[in-house]
UniProtKB/Swiss-Prot annotation:
Protein name: Leucine--tRNA ligase
GO BP annotations listed: leucyl-tRNA aminoacylation
Catalytic activity: tRNA(Leu) + L-leucine + ATP = L-leucyl-tRNA(Leu) + AMP + diphosphate
Similarity annotation: Belongs to the class-I aminoacyl-tRNA synthetase family.
Motif ('KMSKS' region) on chain: 610-614
Compartment(s): Cytoplasm
Length: 833
């Protein structure tokens, strides 16, 4: 049997593509454009795993398909190379993070090239390259000039082990850091913030303009968290103080029986009575140690302390005790709430715990047993009694505005983006703080502000980054003799990834971020493929920066990414014991088709789980490429199932994909190729071209491969293969298995040219139509024969054919035919006696 030698074929074609710059981005202005973007990777020390190529293969198939369809294709790759892991490694080993990063990039690039992706490497970007981050810094200076980057003393999520503050989005639900899983505490610090809140409404509205999964849009909508309601002002009894509360349910104001301020609220100390001062101070101290997520956990026990003061409910004059509690956050809304315990679960639990009044103001439920959180007509609410929710809200807002104690208000859950990091390995923030108290941005002519090389990269522990120790870089003097210090905080890893897709369009421009005409030509990105874990952070930040650049006239579109696709996760083979605990693969043996724990002998259940070093089930693509070839890996990952599904890795599936490619190789290299078309494959060939074209366009790669298999099976039944069909088939499979595609194309054409730009095959609609149909012949209601006849025969012709059939004649010999019922294209029923 003939098998192809992937170890010879794949490196040969990779060298050909590199030497000939086969995938250089097209510049023919008369052609349509197609911009296919992968989420660029962080080049970790571990290298690529088999999950990376799944998304990369999808965009590569689309890119190869669109090139063959006559598009200019921009399909680039680069490196999101700043970030904590390289710095952590450098601190642990004493090595330079830049060297470590460069080694990792070289390894990633080697692995990516071994998989045959059609990237235009002339456009490679690296976020740690000063020629790249010059423009990251330039964008920051524009944000600063527009008042969208500002300094503030804010309570931050401080991670002692990382020596830095992290953004809200980087804190996990259990109150630990996304990176490393370390404890997060709240600590007030001077920080750079970006005013993403100024764009909240546009970030929300423009989601309607993009073709993204609805689940991702919903995650962004929830994160932005738009609420329409009212601000209500409460006076503090026997003082000249007051505070404002935002509520989405101003109609329940008659049921507000107490108020809660965040422990950090500016009013707390001023209204706390002497006998409550110690308890309040203690509580504030404890609250400062908890993260926002830990504080707002619905399941946690409710805690709080009374300030000793009362607020006056403006609608009925009732006194309401003012408490502080950590479930109210200073950073959310106004940092104060009015509690309506009859109709809010959290308020109800708090009221029960501290024996506070519960007054129902909506009909329905038993508020002694539980909060009633559904809608009902208003009761115990004076001028709102008998009204429904919408009418009551409108009437209460009208009353608040007329009385001067409130107004209609829209708020957002979205907070400004905490942008500074107290670390070394990031873009320096291009700001100078002068001794006269002013601050200025570094002028464009002095950008990039290059990160200085230093051995001392440990966090200072003072809240400043290690750059505070690099004196000759840190200290500057103005022409007028005024001394200054450079900003020592660096940017987060999200900075470089918020605009990299723009730099690919014009990566070597030294005068500007990118040429306006080129941006007009290529934006927006046509397809962006990556993991759903970036739903909020990266995608929201990139959309924000893009909108700022749109307002500056730099980019011509409101949105960066027209279509987004999230590939699923490739799960590893793993095993569970009877307790549900996962068992590492090196502790498992297979006997008679079952799996057993090597140490305990217990029978285990196979259960796919996320690949991890601890389970020893990480599959390295290098090993797969060596054993089976890159084309096999590509075809297998696309054939596993729908691209957006999470599916377990299977060695058997991999072997199946390799066997299929061997069959393809044999079909083209051993079958007699002829210039004469017998017509036998007309229908299946044209069906295959149509199906593969449509399914690749819709990213249904698994069904496209299934159709290619149908063609191979049909072609193998014939003695000869029509040369046009052989070539067309090789073109169809080439985006999936590009090395094999090139090799077989040369076997058929000996052109010496790549298959990449050969026009995509077309199909003949008339050949898709069946000219023959199968009909059944029934005698006494039982099927006695099946006949293939020309389509659309008349009743008379059908009857004639049926009665002439040998089997039918044998059945009716010597019998009387009572009647014959013929249904064209379906059946002939013969009634005899």
């Amino acid at each position: 049997m003939t098998f192809y030698d992937h170890t010879a074929i794949e490196p040969k074609w990779q060298a050909f593509w590199a030497d000939n710059h086969t995938f250089k981005t097209g510049t023919d202005a008369s052609k349509p454009k197609f911009y296919a973007l992968d989420m660029f990777p962080y080049p970790s020390g571990a290298g690529l795993h088999v999950g990376h190529p799944e998304g990369y293969t999808a965009t590569d198939i689309l890119s190869r398909f669109k090139r063959a369809q006559g598009h200019n294709v921009l399909h680039p790759m680069g490196w999101d190379a700043f970030g904590l892991p390289a710095e952590q490694y450098a601190m642990d080993t004493g090595n330079d993070p830049a060297e470590f990063t460069a080694e990792n990039i070289a390894n990633f690039k080697r692995q990516i090239n071994a998989l045959g992706f059609s990237y235009d490497w002339d456009r490679e970007v690296n976020t740690t390259d000063p020629n790249y981050y010059k423009w990251t810094q330039w964008i920051f200076t524009k944000l600063y000039e527009k008042g969208l980057a500002y300094e503030a003393e804010v309570p931050v999520n401080w991670v002692e082990e990382l020596g830095t503050a992290i953004a809200n989005e980087e804190v996990l639900p259990d109150g630990t850091s996304e990176r490393g899983g370390y404890p997060v505490v709240r600590k007030p610090m001077r920080q750079w913030m970006l005013k993403i809140t100024a764009y909240a409404e546009r970030l929300l509205e423009d989601l309607e303009e993009v073709d993204w999964p609805e689940s991702i849009k919903d995650m962004q909508r929830n994160w932005i968290g738009k609420s329409t309601g009212a601000n209500v002002t409460f006076k503090v009894k026997d003082t000249d103080k007051d505070f404002t509360v935002f509520t989405t349910r101003p109609d329940t104001l008659f049921g507000a029986t107490y108020a809660v301020l965040a422990p950090e609220h500016a009013l707390v100390d001023a209204i706390t009575t002497a006998d409550q001062a110690e308890a309040v101070a203690d509580y504030k101290r404890q609250a400062s140690l908890k993260s926002d997520l830990a504080r707002t956990d619905l399941a946690k026990e409710k805690t709080g302390v009374w300030t000793g003061s009362y607020a006056i409910n403006p609608v009925n004059g009732n006194e309401m005790p003012v408490w502080i509690a950590d479930y109210v956050l200073a950073s959310y809304g106004t940092g104060a709430i009015m509690a309506v315990p009859a109709h809010d679960e959290r308020d109800w639990e708090f009221a029960k715990q501290f024996n506070l009044d519960i007054i129902p103001v909506l009909e329905g439920g038993n508020v002694e047993e539980a909060a009633f959180t559904e809608d009902g007509l208003h009761i115990n609410s004076g001028f709102l009694d008998g009204l429904d929710k919408a009418s009551a809200i409108a009437k209460m807002v009208e009353w608040l505005e007329a009385e001067g104690v409130g107004n209609e208000k829209v708020t957002y859950r979205l907070r400004d983006w905490l942008f500074s990091r107290q670390r070394y390995w990031g873009e320096p923030i291009p700001i100078i703080h002068w001794e006269d108290g002013t601050s200025t941005a570094v002028p464009e002519s002095e950008l990039p502000l290059v990160l200085p090389v230093t051995k001392d990269i440990r966090p200072s522990g003072t809240g400043e980054s290690p750059l505070a120790n690099v004196t000759d870089w840190l200290e500057v003097t103005r022409e007028d003799g005024v001394k200054g210090r450079r900003e020592t905080n660096t940017m987060p890893q999200w900075a470089g990834s918020s605009w990299y897709y723009l730099r690919y369009i014009d990566p070597h421009n030294t005068e500007k971020l990118a040429d306006e005409e080129l941006l007009k030509q290529w934006l927006p990105v046509d397809i962006y493929v990556g993991g759903a874990e970036h739903a909020v952070l990266h995608l929201l930040y990139a959309r924000f920066w893009h909108k700022v650049l749109y307002d500056l006239g730099v980019v011509p579109t409101k949105e960066p990414f027209q279509k987004l696709f999230n590939q699923g996760m490739i799960l590893g083979t793993s095993y569970r014991d009877s307790r549900g605990a996962l068992v590492a693969t090196d502790k498992v043996e297979k006997r008679d088709g079952s799996f057993f724990h090597l140490e305990t002998g217990e029978e285990l259940e196979q259960a796919p789980a996320k690949m991890s070093k601890s389970l020893k089930n990480v599959v390295n693509p290098d090993d797969v490429v060596e054993q089976y070839g890159a084309d096999t890996l590509r075809v297998y990952e696309m054939f596993m199932g729908p691209l957006d599904a999470s599916i377990a890795w299977s060695e058997e599936g991999l072997e199946g994909s390799r066997k299929f490619l061997d069959r393809v190789y044999r079909l083209i290299t051993t079958k007699e190729i002829t210039e004469e078309n017998s017509g036998a494959l007309d229908k299946v060939y044209n069906e295959t071209v149509k199906a593969v074209t449509e399914q690749v366009d819709q990213m249904k790669f698994n069904t496209a491969i299934a159709q290619l298999m149908v063609f191979v099976n049909a072609a193998n039944k014939e003695d000869k293969l029509f040369s046009d069909y052989a070539k067309g088939f090789v073109q169809l499979i080439a985006p999936f298995a590009p090395h094999l595609g090139e090799e077989l194309w040369q076997a058929l054409t000996a052109s010496g040219e790549s298959i990449s730009y050969v026009p995509w095959p077309s199909y003949d609609e008339s050949k898709l139509v069946e000219n023959d149909v199968e009909i059944v012949v029934q005698i006494k209601g039982k099927v006695k024969a099946k006949l293939v006849v020309a389509k659309d025969l008349s009743r008379e012709e059908l009857q004639e054919v049926a009665l002439a059939n040998e089997k039918v004649q044998a059945e009716i010999a010597g019998k009387d035919i009572i009647k014959v019922i013929a249904v064209p294209n379906k059946l002939v029923n013969i009634v005899i006696k």
